[in-house]
A protein has these predicted regions:
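Catalytic, metal-anchored helix/loop core of enzyme active sites in primary metabolism
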Residues: 1-310
Length: 310
């Protein structure tokens, strides 16, 4: 059970990979941060919901934090030991999801089955729906803000359907360093386990000649409003991330159960965040318990808004 996970994560080991999905991963990952020399982080909630508290725990313990998500791993590798003063901007890439070329009218009628078809990766249903709404990029921008020494306005997203370039960093001299590879999670996992060395991984090797060309485009925030929620959440700070993340999880569940239409996912998550602001629920967390309480409040706000669709 949960107590056993926390006990296992608390053991003094060289590296812990934190890959428990959802808020259930918060306490074990915090325990790992206090005990491990290195935490390979694949749990979004630790940074999205508990960013400042979690990073404080990492710093206090003197632990090393390495990102496992392909986009953040790409940025980490691109920055390496660069002086933060020379970083001009960080760009995360994304496939654009299964509805990249769909009109707003088409997306309004999208089914859970259609939303669950990621163009490049095989993932769980919730994560794939986040990719369809671009909420995954919203959450990744929030994570990047906590992981890397940049301001909010130095972070952006581009749509890259082939998902060969996973992220890139532009420096003050105009040069850009990017990390490339086939869309295979074994590569960033291997990087986080071996860094700064490299280990052999069975990922498919990249053949640029066979690919021929790579394309990039700006995301359409009119059709994908979830992306704009990252800026709002970071402007608010505090427990805003916990409320947004929890509300989104409940909204995705409601969509998968056919209770709400696809466009309502981002709308409901955003509305829950603003209701949290209006009712004074967004505050600065002092500890992990405050974050978990905010997660519960976000779910309660989402449930209240969901009643409008019943």
């Amino acid at each position: 059970g949960p107590a056993a996970l926390i006990e296992a994560a608390s053991r003094p080991v060289d590296c812990v990979m934190a890959a428990i999905v959802g808020a259930a991963g918060l306490r074990p990952t915090f325990a790992a941060a206090r005990a491990a020399r290195r935490v390979a982080l694949a749990n979004k909630e630790c940074l999205v919901s508990a960013g400042t508290v979690f990073m404080s725990a990492i710093k206090e313990a003197g632990a090393e934090l390495l990102p496992v998500d392909s986009e953040h791993s790409a940025v980490h590798q691109s920055i390496a030991d660069t002086d933060p003063r020379f970083i001009e901007r960080i760009v995360l890439t994304g496939s654009g999801g299964p509805f990249r070329t769909w009109s707003a009218e088409q997306m309004a009628a999208a089914t859970p089955e259609q939303a669950a078809r990621h163009p490049n990766f095989s993932m769980g249903r919730k994560i794939t729906v986040d990719s369809a709404t671009l909420m995954n990029k919203c959450l990744e921008l929030i994570e990047a803000f906590h992981l890397f020494p940049v301001a909010v306005d130095q972070l952006s997203v581009v749509v890259h359907p082939q998902q060969i370039v996973h992220g890139f960093v532009e420096f003050t001299d105009g040069s850009v360093i990017a990390q490339m590879g086939t869309p295979d999670m074994r590569t960033p996992i291997a990087s986080s386990l071996a860094w700064p060395a490299r280990m052999s991984a069975p990922a498919t090797r990249l053949d640029l000649v066979r690919l021929g060309s790579l394309t990039f485009e700006a995301p359409d925030e009119q059709r994908f409003p979830a992306l704009g929620l990252a800026r709002r959440t970071l402007e608010l700070g505090g427990t805003a991330g916990a409320i947004l993340n929890a509300a989104n999880e409940d909204a995705v569940d409601a969509f998968l159960e056919r209770q709400i239409p696809f466009p309502a996912i981002a709308a409901l998550a955003g509305a829950a965040l603003e209701e949290g602001v209006r009712t004074g629920r967004v505050c600065e967390p002092a500890c992990l318990d405050d974050v978990i309480a905010a997660d519960e409040e976000g779910r309660a706000l989402a449930r209240g808004l969901l009643r409008r669709y019943s």
